[in-house]
Swiss-Prot record:
It comes from Escherichia coli O6:H1 (strain CFT073 / ATCC 700928 / UPEC). Pfam families: FAD_binding_3. The lineage of its organism: Bacteria, Pseudomonadati, Pseudomonadota, Gammaproteobacteria, Enterobacterales. Belongs to the CbrA family. This is Protein CbrA. GO terms for molecular function: FAD binding. It comes from the Bacteria.
Amino acid sequence: MEHFDVAIIGLGPAGSALARKLAGKMQVIALDKKHQHGTEGFSKPCGGLLAPDAQRSFIRDGLTLPVDVIANPQIFSVKTVDVAASLTRNYQRSYININRHAFDLWMKSLIPASVEVYHDSLCRKIWREDDKWHVIFRADGWEQHITARYLVGADGANSMVRRHLYPDHQIRKYVAIQQWFAEKHPVPFYSCIFDNAITDCYSWSISKDGYFIFGGAYPMKDGQTRFTTLKEKMSAFQFQFGKAVKSEKCTVLFPSRWQDFVCGKDNAFLIGEAAGFISASSLEGISYALDSAEILRSVLLKQPEKLNTAYRRATRKLRLKLFGKIVKSRCLTAPALRKWIMRSGVAHIPQLKDYPTRFTSPTSRM
């Protein structure tokens, strides 16, 4: 039975970043259910926007995005829609439009060969015995059993590691549903949609590489019905759909209290969405995945006396920031307050009536 210093379950942005940062410094094994290349197998349903905080993480690490990860077009504002109030406002945002699956595979490709990575693998069982973490997983057609001094759960909303560590912990969850359509809008856009009759979270759309993606986070019980109802409502706001090219769904966490952020125990650690590190106001999680990976890297390499306590303390600033997002979310999803903010026109950028209806080159209008 092979033994490692660190076993990482999940290679989304959080797990991939941590594996890369620990390579050559600790003996690391990493398991991921995505394939190493291509579009077969699991891919994360996601709008695919890289927030400024995530961009800062790449600056800190000296990384630049390859062109095949970046999607077209790049959009500089979010169209915010309040369905019940029939209000639309435009707010400036500095997101980078990316292909999320290509981004995830690129992040994995940065992991050095010194890390033992198993792609297209399935973690079957974990338990702690004799001060070691035992992991049974299936990869390459057969079942394997390894042990590790430290276990890291970077396995997202349905984290097996979190459920093992905190079997009684309950956190609010939604089903995120997305559909892809051929783009029909003359000017591509990114939108954020609020309709409290549909969901007390929010919905979104994004134009990406010739497609129009429409999605949202809805109650688990009847999410599909609510999603369909909202699509019908959006025709009044000039949203154009047609026949769906692809449909996706997954579970998404929605932290609503301080206790929803869980960091781990017994030499097991949680990073990214597995720890509840996701913004309640935007459902953006990549930046917090990268930040929590950097924090855990520092703790593991410094080896303080009580690692779990040190990690919990080190993430306090991050958790406070995310708690602020919970407060912001409550403001945004409160109909009266949201309506007042949007009607005030604060930070709204009106669009000119005669702006070009299609992307054209300067010479085409001469």
